[in-house]
Regions:
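Extracellular glycoside hydrolase catalytic/binding regions
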Residues: 55, 98-107, 111, 201-203, ...
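An active-site-proximal structural segment forming one wall of the substrate-binding cleft
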Residues: 101-130, 138-140, 146-228, 255-263
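Aromatic-rich peripheral "rim/lid" segments of glycoside hydrolase catalytic domains that contact
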Residues: 380-473
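Lectin-type carbohydrate-recognition ectodomains
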Residues: 469-645
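Active-site-proximal beta-strand/loop segments in catalytic clefts of secreted hydrolases
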Residues: 76-81, 133-137, 182-186, 230-235, ...
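Secretory targeting and sorting signals
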Residues: 1-34
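N-terminal carbohydrate-binding accessory modules
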Residues: 32-129
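Surface-exposed, active-site-proximal loop segments in enzymatic domains
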Residues: 88-94, 98-103, 136-161, 189-204, ...
Length: 645
């Protein structure tokens, strides 16, 4: 589901499809000879369950299971619980629902097919995980779904939408699937543009949104195969305001996702936290600035969570949209290129620029990227550009070994056997007959089999060092679980604390940003951490003559700092279990960047426009020097870097 302002192409594609299949007719399954690509191996639920161990986490650019083995997200979107009503007309009239499919605010298809059979079809597609969209409205919806909405699953009669979701989640995880919950909308409305669901705080407060997430996280915490929280779908401009990434206000998606992710992890530490970038900014005319930032802002402002092994970034791509194109036809359309109009090489470059760059190792932003929505119309799709785009895009996913989720999984066929939403991977008739991408006659089969069966990295993923940034631009940035449980350690100042598994390794000058790492991380002792507000711990001589200094006690290393304005205030130090060297070097960055030539996050900028000082990966920060002389304003000018051993 992607932002568009007028023309909903995916729904229209479903209406344009033609088919001679009769209601209830079973269709032959596609073969390798039909497609040129062998279909994926079909695992039973027991086989899928045995193939991975929950919970999931991340190492470098990969999602891994509890054993450290690669778990590539081969996913699909089972839509419906986010609502299908299109916002006008009688909500009880199926004609007013997306592709004339009324979900009754539960996953589509439960009226037509037993859930076990639906999941068997998901297995046949080669999936191992399901993205499950929902609306915040579902959480407080006490209405009972009509019996007709669960006709093929009578065990679900008499349940509310949330209770139906409970049963669906339990069925999926029992059958071996990993489940990722996706907050798709606030209200039960489909879909996009100016629909009242533009931001996480559209129609609700940010606090309510976070509370809802914590509620759901706790609801499913005992089911370890509920593996992730996909925080919000396609954040975009509303009538008056753009979302932003890092302004510190109520429209700041970076700030909101940071807060929500940490609250979720405090409640349920096992979950992956999935953050999608900004889907649209600006007014789409040829005379006004506009565009689709996606993950590009992450290059200079990434997120750091209290569990640094839990962050996954996400992005959406559809052929009829573009980096600066809404996907609209008519009102809201500009003359910017659509993704489907790029050459294969151009498309690969723009997808890397907008999203896949995040998978580069050793940077402050390094994380897995999940393309959590993409797709194309199947049967009846005659647009050559659309078809070529799908082939080219799936080629990109294969080459980059990228995690993915196709949109959508389930749709309906009408009384003539014609798919109502040709984008769906499987469509069911009223009596449950299936017409899917695994059946003959769908042009997407070759590309789908190519994608889901592509070779990629498997087996154990070795732990890799991490670098994560701290952003004190507007407020505290406390991602230490230890310090979050303690009183304010530097009242009246903005504070930045590294995750408990990391230490401070760099500071920005005049912008209050910091860099943390776990490269060569010394073990922390169990003793108290020290807040340094003066020079009482300075040792080894006056290493920055004429400058004020904050230095950790010998045997400890910096894990946090505080500032007033951008001026240095205090240093937070944690004790090491083993002795640390007390010799070192002074690293000045008052006149230029002073960063290692090689090593962590040296190819990325975590404090753009400001000088940065960064100790080597084999060092720890033992002290910071600053001065109020010469109009320096008390900002950090030098680091005392000491070797780890």
């Amino acid at each position: 589901m992607t932002t568009r302002f007028t023309h909903f192409r995916r729904a229209a594609a479903g209406l344009a499809a033609s088919s001679v299949l009769l209601l209830g007719t079973l269709t032959p399954q596609a073969t390798a000879a039909d497609t040129g690509t062998a279909p994926p191996p079909v695992l039973t639920g027991a086989q899928l369950a045995a193939s991975w161990t929950a919970p999931l986490s991340t190492r470098d650019r990969y999602v891994v299971d509890a054993n450290g083995d690669r778990f590539k997200l081969k996913s699909g979107n089972w839509a419906g619980a986010q609502g299908t009503w299109q916002g006008s007309g009688d909500v009880g009239d199926v004609a007013n629902h997306q592709a004339r499919q009324m979900s009754h605010n539960i996953p589509l298809g439960l009226d037509r097919k037993p859930i076990a059979d639906i999941l068997a079809d998901f297995h046949a597609l080669g999936l191992n995980s399901i993205r499950l969209p929902f609306a915040n409205a579902m959480i407080r919806d006490t209405s009972v779904v009509p019996d007709s909405a669960v006709a093929a699953n009578p065990q679900l009669k008499g349940k509310t939408p949330l209770q139906v979701l409970d049963a669906v989640v339990a069925a999926m995880t029992t059958d071996g699937f990993a489940v990722i919950l996706n907050n798709h909308t606030t209200s039960y409305r489909f879909c996009c543009g100016l629909d009242g669901n533009e931001r996480w705080n559209s129609g609700q407060s940010t606090q309510q949104w976070i509370d809802d997430w914590v509620f759901l996280a706790k609801r499913y915490k005992d089911d370890k195969r509920v593996v992730g929280a996909d925080l919000r779908n396609e954040v975009r401009r509303d009538t008056w305001n753009d979302p932003n990434w890092g302004w510190g206000n109520d429209h700041d998606l970076n700030k909101a996702m940071e807060e929500a992710g940490n609250k979720i992890l405090q409640a349920v530490p096992d979950l992956l936290v999935i953050m999608e970038g900004i889907n649209w900014q600006g007014i789409p005319t040829d005379l006004t600035p506009h565009g689709r930032p996606t993950l590009t802002p992450v290059a200079t402002l990434s997120n750091t969570l209290i569990r640094s092994d839990k962050l996954v970034y996400a992005a959406h791509f559809y052929g009829y949209t573009g980096p600066n194109h809404t996907g609209a036809t008519g009102t809201g359309e500009t003359h910017d290129p659509r993704y489907e109009e790029f050459t294969p090489a151009q498309l690969a470059q723009v997808v890397d620029d907008q999203a896949l760059f995040v998978t580069r190792s050793g940077q402050h932003f390094t994380a897995p990227v999940w393309i959590s929505e993409f797709g194309a119309g199947g049967r009846g799709e005659i647009d050559a550009k659309e078809r070529a785009w799908f082939t080219n895009f799936t080629d990109i996913l294969v080459r980059n070994d990228t995690d993915f989720a196709i949109w959508p999984l389930v749709g309906w066929t009408d009384a003539n056997g014609t798919p109502q939403d040709t984008w769906a991977m499987v469509n069911y008739s009223a009596n449950g007959a299936r017409l899917g991408v695994m059946d003959a006659g769908d042009w997407r089969t070759t590309d789908w089999n190519k994608l889901v069966g592509a070779p990629g990295r498997t087996g154990r993923i070795a732990p890799a060092p991490r670098w994560n940034m701290l952003n004190l631009d507007y407020a505290d940035y406390n991602v230490s679980a230890t310090m979050l449980a303690k009183p304010d350690w530097s009242p009246g100042n903005r504070k930045g604390n590294c995750p408990d598994t990391q230490r401070l390794v760099g500071l920005g000058r005049s912008d209050s940003r910091g860099l943390c790492t776990d490269a060569g991380q010394p073990a922390k002792a169990s003793g108290p951490w020290t807040v340094v507000t003066d020079e009482r711990y300075v040792s080894g001589g006056d290493w920055a003559s004429g400058y004020d200094k904050r230095q950790c006690p010998d045997g400890s290393f910096a894990v946090g700092y505080s500032v007033r304005g951008n001026a240095m205030s205090a240093l937070l130090c944690a004790p090491a279990t083993a002795s640390l060297p007390t010799t070192g070097r002074v690293l000045w960055f008052d006149k230029a960047d002073n960063r290692p030539a090689t090593g962590g996050s040296t190819a990325s900028d975590w404090a753009p426009g400001h000088y940065k000082g960064q100790c080597a990966d084999t060092e720890y920060v033992a002290g910071v020097a600053f001065t109020w002389k010469w109009n320096h304003g008390g900002v950090p000018d030098a680091l005392l870097c000491r070797p780890l051993g």
